[in-house]
Amino acid sequence: MNQDAAGNTIPGVAESWETTDNKTFIFHLRKNAKWSNGDPVTAEDFVYSFKRAVDPATASPYSWYLEMTTMENAADIIAGKKDKETLGVKALDANTLEIKLESAVPYFVKMMGHTTVKPVHRATVEKWGDQWTKPDHFVGNGAYVLDKWVVNERMELKRNPNYWDNEHTVINKVTYLPIENQVAEMNRFLSGEIQITNELPLEHFKRLQKEHPESVQVQGNLCTYYYGFNNQKAPFNDVRIRKALSYAIDRNIITDAILGQGQKPAYFLTPEITAGFHPEMPAYGR
């Protein structure tokens, strides 16, 4: 699945799907979906990839995500209690994928837009092992494929002519530059060396917004910043203390006076810009 600019779920490799109980989902894959080497993208590719993601031998840092979906047996497989072959995923045919959950999850289709559930090319992974992501080996099924990768210097992507929606791809090449220093990144942007940056030094933000209003745009970021504390120990094991602390924090001072880059006060863990999320503001936030 993919997401549009507003965060709404839209078809990706799966052109349609259905469920009657929010526990068993059937996804119908596009017959014209291909890997960058020309191989067809099949339901079996997803079966292999999901099993690989939960396999303890893979040690995926995002295996928890499949557990969060409640995919059948995912939790036990990750914990080493069951074999990966028991995962609730099955290829009904080359273009039909069945996924079974342990609990009804109405938003499951939305969860299928996460990077963790994107398929990997089995033949490439099995041939090259931990070297499968090298530019000379990599095979993907997205709009771009990895062309060059110099660690800590640059990553270059080129257009994938075999992508199922290639006719709507408008950029032929994308280069990512890993720049740790925000001031250096800002200067390279101002000099025209890079076209897009999503970070600006806090102390320069207001000046740049005034001097380059056409370039500096503030858009919502789907994340939440929060203070964490141990609620298993006193005094934070008392819900009244936790509420008092929340009431005492002036979120507007933090967002407007300290950060001042368009952040909004948060009264929910889920960002307000999340598609379909329409919360009622708590009394202390009004």
Q: Where are each of the predicted segments found?
A:
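Aromatic- and charge-enriched surface segment that lines or borders ligand/interaction sites
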Residues: 15-65, 98, 188, 235
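A structural "hinge/loop" feature
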Residues: 9-13, 39, 61-62, 108-118, ...
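Extracellular/periplasmic solute-recognition and catalytic clefts
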Residues: 147-158, 175-233, 252, 256-257
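Structural transition elements
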Residues: 264-286
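Gly/Pro-rich hinge or "lid" segments in bacterial periplasmic/extracellular proteins
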Residues: 72-75, 80, 86, 94-95, ...
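N-terminal lobe/hinge region of extracytoplasmic solute-binding protein
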Residues: 1-21, 51, 137-140
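Periplasmic solute-binding protein
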Residues: 18-36, 102, 110-112, 220-233, ...
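Sec-exported extracytoplasmic/periplasmic mature domains
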Residues: 1, 5, 22, 30, ...
